[in-house]
Amino acid sequence: MINKRFIIFIFILFISYIISFINFISNLNKDNITHVQSKTIVVITGSVGRLTAAENLINLNSEARLLISGVAKGVKFSEIIKSKSIDPKKVDLGYNAKSTFGNAIETKVWVSNNNIKDFILITDDWHMKRALLLFKNSMPNINIYPYELKSNSKSLREHLLFEEHLKYLIAHLQVIYIWFTN
């Protein structure tokens, strides 16, 4: 026979998850494109729209610098950046990250090596909450300005939200790891 306390615990856990999920999705439909001017841009690889947004921002600021984090091994600048007006010397390709946690660590090293105080972070709306959690905890003294791109596909978006919410919960454990290692 199942213990009554265990059933109550499972019920509380389920309700907590539902509340957490509602909180997670509550900010997704807001316009969260930053209007801050920063000379530094970080884009996490993923959708093509992320790179297009990064190209547009770097073209608006002749002094801007760009890190593309999470680039697959062997991929060259010319395969990623389609705009001929972008100076390759202003773009760094990060080949070490394999996850959002890895993107945060890769960016932390790049920020430290380049004495950067702030940057615009570009990723999709469904990914931003987790990315900001990891990036801000990896670099607490750096100002990070989110530049969220709206997801286009509704069915893909609905599927991703549940998966992304679970990853967001797991990211909290990664934050604990960051705290212990800093």
Q: Predicted segment positions?
A:
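Short, Lys/Arg-enriched, disordered terminal segments
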Residues: M1-I10, N32, N115, Y177-N182
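Sequence-level detector for tyrosine residue identity
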Residues: Y17, Y95, Y145-Y147, Y168, ...
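A structural signal for short, hydrophobic/glycine-enriched beta-strand patches
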Residues: F24-F162
